[in-house]
A protein has these predicted regions:
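Active-site glycine- and acidic-residue-rich loops that bind
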Residues: 33-36, 126-137, 165-176
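Surface-exposed, active-site-proximal loop segments in enzymatic domains
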Residues: 63-81, 109-127, 168-169
Length: 189
């Protein structure tokens, strides 16, 4: 069994710098997640490829102008940014020899970067069924592109905090409970 350690715990470093720290500590299976933007991150990580195996998670590599990846967004700008980011990630997987790319299920509203992992401010929610349909449509598209590149995709469920549930009085995230996870999983390739 292989256990991957995430670079996400080093939010103040670029992924190549946090990977160097992990490699020095004896960790050679690294999940690239988060960190700060650096235009040379992928090139620098390629230099570490002989010392570590990489997988990529969600919002990596972080873009120069931050946004929240949302594959269920009904906002054309956000959905286009999200899909372009995923296309870039799949290319990064190829460069780094990563065989898997994981991303989170979508959201029923578009979040601000500062809200990630914290209480989400109440806002109008998108229709859940329409967002699920859009998410599935985009997952099919991503899945075909990934398969053509020999990359497997993984969808990670979301976690609804008590604060966000109280704020919205309903669930603004996809795939937080077993029923919805099963419903979506049964429809993906």
């Amino acid at each position: 069994m292989t256990i991957y350690v995430s670079t996400g715990g080093y939010s103040n470093l670029s992924a190549d710098k946090s990977s160097e720290k992990l490699i020095k500590a004896g960790i050679s299976s690294i999940e690239l997640s988060g960190g700060i933007y650096s235009k040379d991150t992928i090139d620098n990580l390629c230099k570490l490829e002989k010392k570590a195996k990489f997988q990529i998670h969600n919002y990596f590599p972080p873009p120069k102008i931050p946004f929240v990846l949302n594959l269920a967004s009904q906002n054309c700008d956000i959905s286009n940014l999200s899909l372009r980011h995923v296309d870039h990630v799949l290319d990064c997987c190829l460069k780094l020899g990563a065989t898997h790319y994981s991303f989170h299920a979508g959201f029923l509203c578009d979040l601000e970067v500062a809200e990630l992992g914290k209480k989400i401010k109440k806002k109008e929610l998108y229709d859940r069924e329409k967002s699920i349909d859009l998410f599935l449509e985009r997952v099919f598209l991503i899945s075909k592109k990934a398969e053509n590149k020999g990359i497997k995709i993984m969808i990670e469920n979301n976690v609804l905090s008590a604060k966000s549930k109280n704020e919205f009085q309903e669930n603004p995230l996809l795939m937080c409970d077993a029923e919805e996870c099963i419903k979506i999983i049964r429809q993906v390739p």
